[in-house]
From Swiss-Prot:
It comes from Bombina maxima (Giant fire-bellied toad). GO terms for biological process: defense response to bacterium; defense response to fungus; killing of cells of another organism. It comes from the Eukaryota. Maximin-3 shows antibacterial activity against both Gram-positive and Gram-negative bacteria. It also shows antimicrobial activity against the fungus C.albicans, but not against A.flavus nor P.uticale. It has little hemolytic activity. It possess a significant cytotoxicity against tumor cell lines. It possess a significant anti-HIV activity. It shows high spermicidal activity. Maximin-H9 shows antimicrobial activity against bacteria and against the fungus C.albicans. Shows strong hemolytic activity. GO terms for cellular component: extracellular region. This is Maximins 3/H9 type 2. InterPro entries: Bombinin. Keywords: Amidation, Amphibian defense peptide, Antibiotic, Antimicrobial, Cleavage on pair of basic residues, Cytolysis, Fungicide, Hemolysis, Secreted, Signal. Expressed by the skin glands. It is found in: Secreted.
Amino acid sequence: MNFKYIVAVSFLIASAYARSVQNDEQSLSQRDVLEEESLREIRGIGGKILSGLKTALKGAAKELASTYLHRKRTAEEHEVMKRLEAVMRDLDSLDYPEEASERETRGFNQDEIANLFTKKEKRILGPVLGLVSNALGGLIKKIG
């Protein structure tokens, strides 16, 4: 009879442990879902900010291009305009990253693809912002 009690108590302990493990797994999966939703929201906000920044840069570059389009330019200004045109092409390529890098992303999972695009945006936007600020600074000095 003692053996039956030992088996019954062991079974109760094992089932309680299994339930606690299952509850832990559920709470972890719920935390993962919440973290993933938070990351999506952050990426969405970051995407909107980048989109606004790209639009502003495009507008500034187009305005500069139209300002200096009809007057005689020096060689230095011509070089600045070429750089601005290259910046515009880079910004346009950011609008359609799937087409631009379709071959690179085959075989990657979704996280790797998201990280790849984020790295590409940082790699392109950093020099682009520097180039635009240098070009604007140089043009403002010449005007003033």
